[in-house]
Design a protein with these regions (language model features):
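Short S/T/G/P-rich N-terminal loop/turn motif that feeds into the first structured element of a domain
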Residues: 19-65, 69-76, 83-93, 106-143
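Sec-dependent signal peptide recognition
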Residues: 2-8
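Amphipathic alpha-helical coiled-coil segments
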Residues: 100-104
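Generic N-terminal leader/processing signal
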Residues: 1-2, 15
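Hydrophobic h-region of N-terminal signal peptides that target proteins for export
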Residues: 10-18
Length: 143
């Protein structure tokens, strides 16, 4: 599971090519949710790595949310939202090969990944669809 999620995240840059859907906003915004078990005992080191990623991401104009939450039972929840697939790709290029990104995955055991804002084509589109990790919007709105 860990290798699949890491590979998926690494390749996500190429997968976030959204189509026009019934809901025009859904075809533009791209966001994902990640749940991971913290396997390091050094929470301060984890927070330092997260701070590095946050500082890099703050420079990106297409990011609307980049949030990390830590529960009392050491589950890390990450919510990322981008204006569009291009902004998601910029983010992937900016953080994808950094030491901070490599370090954070050594501290976590990914449990769940859900991508919103699809459907997606490209090299990861089939994988995302087959794993059921990109649900289709069936109602609602976003402002």
């Amino acid at each position: 599971m860990k290798k699949k999620v890491i590979s998926l995240l690494a390749g996500l840059v190429f997968a976030v090519n959204a189509h026009a859907e019934d809901n025009a906003l859904a075809s533009k915004s791209v966001h994902w949710y990640i749940k991971a078990k913290v396997i390091t005992e050094d929470i301060d080191a984890l927070k330092a790595v997260i701070s590095e990623l946050v500082e890099i991401t703050k420079t990106e104009t297409g990011v609307t949310n980049y949030e990390f939450y830590l529960s009392e039972n050491n589950m890390l929840y990450v919510f990322e939202r981008y204006l569009n697939s291009d902004a998601g790709a910029v983010h992937g290029a900016n953080v994808g090969e950094t030491e901070a990104m490599k370090n954070i995955f050594s501290m976590l055991e990914p449990k769940e990944f859900v991508l919103f804002g699809g459907p997606y084509e490209g090299p990861w589109g089939g994988y995302i669809k087959s794993q059921g990790i990109s649900p289709k919007l069936i109602g609602g709105f976003n402002r």
